[in-house]
Amino acid sequence: MAGHSKWKNIQKRKNAQDAKRGKIFMKLAKEIYVAAKEGGADPEANSALRLVIEKAKGANMPNENIDRAIKKAAGGQDGSSYEEITYEGYGPSGIAVMVECVTDNKNRTASNVRTAFNKNGGSLGESGCVAFLFERKGFITIDRTERQIEEDELMLDVLEAGGEELRIEEDLYEVFTEPEHFEEVKTALESKYLISSAEVTMLPNTYAEADDQAVEKLETLIDVLEDDDDVQEVYTNYRS
């Protein structure tokens, strides 16, 4: 029976991993759909689509799933139509929270997001209530432990590529760009350096502090939101 129990545990874990992977692929498919719908189905002519395809491949999303999402956006397949919508609100201790969604039913999504806030010490706010606390930026990190890097040379490379700022952390170099220059900076740097991560994201320009109890509630709120099929990204201005 012990062997049978072990097999059941392995199978349960595998099923959970499969479900998690399926959720990731579904969210990526929505992101691909929106990028293709807004900028066209040709990745060569659509930088947003090109970047999300790269992101999807990095998550080992099958090519047929990627192609299906693009064809759907181009009108080659029937199905639901998705749109982007961002919700803003306050978490525990007044921490600013932004929730980026892609949905085919705004009423359902708004209800789910509002419930998540209400049940976890927060409140959903009006559009614009916290957006001013964030700025959309290209954000690239470079591993500084893998090999020796001349910081002056890296700074020059960042600026010449069109980057905005270089920050030095303990294990990483952080490169900031305007969103429109993100891809060219990333392409220039990855030919010479080991890039750990690269994304266009929302970065806080003001940070909030919170006690342990509020942080625990905030983490639960983020988990609940991220588990929602319609939610793509959750941003906060909490300083960890």
Swiss-Prot record:
It is found in: Cytoplasm. GO terms for cellular component: cytosol. Keywords: Cytoplasm, DNA-binding, Transcription, Transcription regulation. Coiled coil: none annotated. It comes from the Bacteria. One of its GO terms (biological process) is regulation of DNA-templated transcription. The keyword Nucleotide-binding does not apply. GO terms for molecular function: DNA binding. It holds the Pfam family TACO1_YebC_N. NCBIfam families: PRK00110.1 (NF001030), PRK12378.1 (NF009044), YebC/PmpR family DNA-binding transcriptional regulator (TIGR01033). Belongs to the TACO1 family. This is Probable transcriptional regulatory protein YrbC. It comes from Bacillus subtilis (strain 168).
